[in-house]
Amino acid sequence: MDKKYLISTNYEIDSLSNFEKKVASHLSDSSKIFNYDELIKNTKFFKKKNTLKSKKHCKRLTNKIFNQLYFHITQDTKSVISKKAYSIILIPFLNIFIETIYEKFIQYNKVVLRNKKLTLMLLNKKNFIYFKNFAEFISLSQNDLFNLQLVSEIIYFNKYSNNKKIIENRKLKTFFKKTKNYFFERFNQISKTNYSYINKKKDLNSSIAMFKIDFRHDIFLKEFLKYKVPLKKNLNKKFFEKFNLIEVKQDNDLREKILYKLKSNLKIENFIFKMAIKYLPSLYFESISMNLENIENNIVNVPKFLISNAHGWWTDDKFKFYAAICIKNKTKYFDVQHNGTYFMIDKNPHFMISKYFRDYFIGWGSACEQDKYSIKLPVLYNVNNQSTKIKNNFTNKNHKIIFMGASIKRYFGGYFQSYLTGGNSFLYYHSQYQFINNLSKNIRKNLILRLRHNNRDPRGYIDYLKRNFKGLKYEDIKISAASRLTDNNVKIIVVDHCSTPWLEALQANKPIILFWSKSENSINKKYLPLINILKKYKIYFECPIAAANRLEEISKKNIKWWYKDKNIQKLRKKILDLFFYNNSKPVKLWNEKIKKIYYGKF
C-alpha cells in the first residue's frame, strides 16, 4: 500500500514520487501552488479560532520564561539591570518566537492526531540550523528548511506512533549556513566565563535622542531638529558603530537548571519551555553582562528622552542594548506608532509588547488616548487631502484605479490578530483574485496593482495573475503611496487589508473601496459600529464580489459625488481623527507636546 505523506513545506516534495505528491496531505497552503479553480472546489480554508485566547496564553508563557531568565541574570552574574531594561532586549524576540512555535504545535498536532495513518517527514537532528539573533530568526521563520526543522521538533517531542521518513541533506545545510553568514552580522564569540558585571551609573544629559522614527519621516526629522529647546539629536548609524557586541557560548548546565524550574502539566507548555530555552540566542542571555558593560564603556551619559518605534529598531540589537542602558539609567522611552493596525485591530502586538518598557506612547489619533500616558500627535505620513484640487480640476483623464495590496507572509510569523501575519495566505489571495475576476475588462484596463508579493514566491500567485489577466498593470512600489495617491489621474482607490493604506486613502480623499474579512482580523469591538457605518455607505465590504460590483458602479460616476455626500465626508473626518490625525503644523505640535512633558507640565 502506498504511503500518504503529510507535507509541511516545499522542501519535502522533491523527495516524493509523482503519485505520492498527488495524494499527499498538506499541513497548510505554504507548500502548495496557487490555483483558483482548485480552491473553489475545496473552500475549507484554515480559519482562525480563539486567537486572542492563544495570544493571552502565549503572553503568560512569555512572562514565565522571562521571569526565570531575569532571575538568573541578576542572581548568577549579579548584573544590575531592571526588568524594564532587560525586557527591551528580550521580550520582542521571546514573544514572537513563542507565538510562532505555539501556532505550529497546535496546527500540526491537530492534523496528526486526526489521522494516525499519515507518514510524517522530518529532518535528521544533525541537519538542524540555529539562529544567532532576532533578525536571523525573522528571516528563517519564512524558510522551508527551518519550518521543517520546527515541525521535526514537534514530531521528536510528541513521539507520534505514525510512520516516519527522515530526510537528510547536509549539502543544503552547508549552503544555507554560508548564505546566512553572508547576510547577517557576525558576533565575536568567546567561551563561557565567570564574568562579573560592574554597574556604572550614567548621568542624564539634557537632550532628546531620536532613532529611526521611520524612513518616511525624514522631512519631519530635519524640521524637528531645528527646534533647539529642548535640545534634540538624531542617533544615526555612525553612533552605533562604536558598539561591538560579544557572543558568549551557551551555558547548557544553567539552561537545564532553568528548564527544570519551568515544568508544567500541559504538554504544549513543556514544548514551548524546551524550545525557548534551547533556541534562545546567547546574545540575549549569557552575553548580557559583557555587552551591557561594553556599551557603558563607550558612552559618557544618556539622553533624558529616547524616541523611536518598532519599525526602526525591532531587530536592531545594538540599539536594544543601548536603549537598555538608557532605561536602566532613568531615560524615558517614547514608543511611536508605525502602522495603521494599531487600535483598529484588537490588542495590536507592537503596542502590547512595548508596554513592557515604554514610558509614553505617541499615537496617530485619538484612539490611542484610551491608554494612560498615550499622546495623540499628527501622523507624519505625507499624504495630501485632494478634495479641493480634484473638485476644481476634474477631467475625464482622472480614470485610473489604484489597488493597494498587502505583503502576506508564507508562514505564520507571530501575532495572531490578522491574516497579515501569514501562515495560510491563500484565503487572502483567493479574496483578491475573486475581486479582480469579477471586474469587467473595461475596469481592469484602468486597474493598477500595487502588490508587495515576492515574484520568487513558490506559491506562484503573481505568475497565476499574469497568465489569467494579461492586461493587468503592476506598479513599482518604490514610488511612495503618498505620492501615488495624489496623482491627478487616480480616480478611485481600492484597499484589501486593514493596515496603513486604507488610512492613507481616506486622507487623500478620493472615492475608496475597502474589502477584508472581519472574521480573519480581530477587529477591536469598540470600532465594529464604525465598520457597520462604512458598510452602510458602501465603502467597506466583506465579500470581494460585492466590492467589485460597487467599483463597477462608482467608476461610471463623476467623482464629485464623493465630496457632495456630507455623511461620507463627516465619517471620513471622524475616522481620520481616530486613527490618522493630520495638522497643518505637525512639527510645531510635536515639539510643544514633548516640551511640556520634558518640563513636567504634561
Question: Where do the language-model regions lie?
Answer:
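Catalytic-core helical/loop segments in enzymes performing group transfer/polymerization on anionic/lipid-linked
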Residues: 1-602
